[in-house]
Design a protein with these regions (language model features):
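Membrane-embedded alpha-helical bundles that constitute the cytochrome b-like, heme-associated redox core
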Residues: 1-170
Length: 170
């Protein structure tokens, strides 16, 4: 593989962009760690309230991050990157936003329906199914994202160093 020269390397992301990125890593990891194992756990009113608030905050931060990133930041991929890699990067990034948004929105819907007494039936089962599919999809997309970052670390094209604060490409 040919390595890109320094003229073609991206300049990097802003401090805010990096903070939002790594903050979401922490928030998502926490959400997975404390996840509800069964819907019946939502009988605990305090847990139900916490889950809905957590999902609402997560969704709000996700929307803020999306608008910040799309309005103020540009891709860290070098201009010489193949068109299909640029397309794949967009699909994975937007896919992560959609899957994260679906996780939070479906979680809120589950919480609202459960609090209204809708604890079984097609509607809540469909929303739980969407929630589970979104979580699974997010795992695959995150794995692709991490693998692509590692790939770019080995390319030494500046993509890794644009967002990752350790193991710089120097």
């Amino acid at each position: 593989m040919e390595q890109s020269n320094s003229v073609n390397k991206p300049s990097g992301y802003s401090f805010i962009a990096k903070t939002l990125h790594w903050g979401f890593v922490a928030i998502f990891a926490y959400g997975i760690y404390k996840q509800v194992d069964t819907i019946e756990q939502l009988e605990d009113a305090a847990l139900l309230r916490f889950e809905v608030i957590f999902a609402a905050v997560f969704l709000t931060l996700l929307l803020l991050r999306f608008f910040y990133m799309t309005r103020t930041q540009s891709s860290s991929l070098p201009e010489s990157t193949a068109w299909w890699q640029k397309l794949a990067a967009k699909v994975v990034h937007y896919g992560i936003y959609v899957s994260f948004g679906s996780i939070a929105a479906s979680g809120i819907l589950i919480g609202v329906l459960y609090s209204l007494g809708v604890k079984a039936g097609f509607v809540i089962e469909a929303i739980v199914g969407l929630h589970e599919i979104s979580v699974t999809l997010s795992y695959y997309l995150i794995a692709l994202h991490v693998l692509a970052a590692i790939y770019h670390r080995f390319l030494k094209d500046g993509v890794w160093s644009a967002m990752v604060p350790v193991c710089k490409e120097d």
